[in-house]
């Protein structure tokens, strides 16, 4: 028979664990971990080229980083997105205003708009591309020397592997908890608590690795000064999951340890 205090601790711990799992799962699947807010470009730009380069172009960290900086990009663990004007030809100019130039980034920039009506802010559309698994494991290089950047490489790999480890541990602890209920044993609860404790550390490590990786990315490719950095709500969800998992771990560990002491005392009393 289980004391009401232990049962209450198990129920509360299970609810906290479920909330943490939902928050972390949503955070992993969304792209709003980090955002860049840039002012509206007042030049004529071929947005079709930018869209094709971002969506179907060759994977290059420097290229997609420049797009994130310029076009109000958002970055997640598995997604990168930009916001471009919703038009198929030229942005902020008419066909007669074009003056084609050869730019290194394959964009065609023209002189500032000279329309009598001025440049109205166009409607924008969000374009998102997911990171493939080989891209996640790709080696990061230093921009100037083209040497492997070990720090950024392993930070990037940890930032998407750690949440998967965290979710796997929570799922495994759920299986252990079900087995404990079927066996009517309180001992596996200690293992459940340890799994949640490690999962909480992995969740915190995810946030730290991601934030450090983004900081190094901005420094490596010299983010423009007019691009404002904003922390997205997805990162906050992942950060909230850390204390929830820790509280769940504390409840499970307390329940397992207290029940063991209580059971030992009852056994000793009966023997005496």
What residue ranges belong to the model's regions?
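Intrinsically disordered terminal tails
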Residues: 1-69, 93, 98-103, 107, ...
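Signature of small four-pass
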Residues: 2-36, 156-213, 241, 245-255
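A surface-exposed beta-alpha-beta supersecondary segment
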Residues: 34-157
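Residues in well-ordered beta-strands of folded domains
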Residues: 82, 163, 238
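N-proximal short alpha-helices
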Residues: 141, 145, 171-174, 260
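Juxtamembrane loop segments immediately following a transmembrane helix
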Residues: 203-236
């Amino acid at each position: 028979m289980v004391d009401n205090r232990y049962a209450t601790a198990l129920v509360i711990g299970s609810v906290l664990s479920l909330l943490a799992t939902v928050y972390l799962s949503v955070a992993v699947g969304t792209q709003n971990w980090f955002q860049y807010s840039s002012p509206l470009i007042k030049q004529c730009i071929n947005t079709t080229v930018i869209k094709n380069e971002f969506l179907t172009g060759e994977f290059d960290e420097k290229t997609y980083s420049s797009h994130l900086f310029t076009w109000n990009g958002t970055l997640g663990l598995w997604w990168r997105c930009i916001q471009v004007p919703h038009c198929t030809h030229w942005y902020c100019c008419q066909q007669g205003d074009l003056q084609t130039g050869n730019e290194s980034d394959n964009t065609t920039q023209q002189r500032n708009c000279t329309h009598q009506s001025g440049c109205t802010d166009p409607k924008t559309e969000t374009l998102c591309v997911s990171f493939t698994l080989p891209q996640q494991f790709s080696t990061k290089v230093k921009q100037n020397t083209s040497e492997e950047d070990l720090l950024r490489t392993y930070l990037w790999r940890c930032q998407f592997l750690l949440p998967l480890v965290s979710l796997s541990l929570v799922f495994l602890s759920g299986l252990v908890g079900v087995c404990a209920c079927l066996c009517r044993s309180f001992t596996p609860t200690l293992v459940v608590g340890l799994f949640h404790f490690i999962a909480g550390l992995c969740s915190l490590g995810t946030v730290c690795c991601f934030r450090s990786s983004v900081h190094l990315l901005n420094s490596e490719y010299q983010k423009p000064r007019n691009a404002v950095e904003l922390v997205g709500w997805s990162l906050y969800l992942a950060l909230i999951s850390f204390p929830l998992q820790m509280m769940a771990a504390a409840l499970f560990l307390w329940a397992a340890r207290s029940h063991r002491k209580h059971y030992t005392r009852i056994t000793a009393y009966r023997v005496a």
